């Protein structure tokens, strides 16, 4: 629904969707990007920010932020590589261009991370260029290191204590994470 959408068009569309397709309709304000992109990008950007804060590697974060959290098994950074870092940057730019601090309290969280800018400048767009946060060379998987701007051997896993924590009932899991002293636990609490 936009300011220029005619009410009759919405009424006709809703009648068709409910009567002919048997679907329910959720009325929403017009907003840039698909809701999944907007929520997904916000989550990915929050994760990227905390990676910088805690100094974790992308392979460890993917291990923590994937299946163990009930998310896609590919985790945050592998998912970004599959989607395409240029596509991700485009979605971020659309949000930056169409939102403002006055219209969205989370506007400042849609800043493009340094690592994403660096990879784009290098021409590393993810899976489509065979290099992004990860790069496969033969049978070896490498991960990007922002400090050296080189690829290093990947495959490091999260500390098993966090895998066990994440299997606990919600209340116990949250208490354990809130009190975690290790960087990985503090990272999980932060995201």
Regions found by a protein language model. Name each.
Residues 1-191:
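N-terminal glycine-rich phosphate-binding loop for ADP-containing cofactors
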């Amino acid at each position: 629904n936009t300011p220029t959408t005619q009410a009759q068009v919405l009424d006709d569309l809703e009648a068709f969707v409910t009567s002919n397709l048997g679907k329910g309709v959720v009325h929403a304000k017009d907003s840039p990007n698909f809701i999944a992109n907007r929520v997904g990008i916000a989550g990915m950007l929050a994760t990227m920010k905390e990676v910088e804060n805690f100094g974790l590697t992308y392979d460890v974060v993917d291990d923590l932020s994937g299946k163990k959290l009930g998310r896609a098994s590919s985790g945050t950074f592998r998912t970004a590589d599959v989607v395409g870092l240029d596509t991700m940057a485009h979605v971020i730019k659309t949000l930056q261009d169409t939102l403002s601090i006055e219209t969205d309290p989370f506007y400042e969280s849609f800043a493009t991370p340094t690592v994403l800018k660096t990879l784009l400048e290098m021409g590393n767009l993810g899976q489509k260029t065979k290099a992004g946060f990860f790069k496969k060379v033969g049978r070896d998987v490498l991960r990007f290191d922002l400090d050296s701007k080189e690829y290093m051997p990947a495959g490091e896993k999260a500390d098993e204590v966090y895998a066990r924590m994440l299997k606990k009932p919600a209340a116990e899991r949250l208490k354990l994470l809130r009190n975690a002293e290790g960087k990985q636990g503090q990272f999980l609490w932060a995201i």
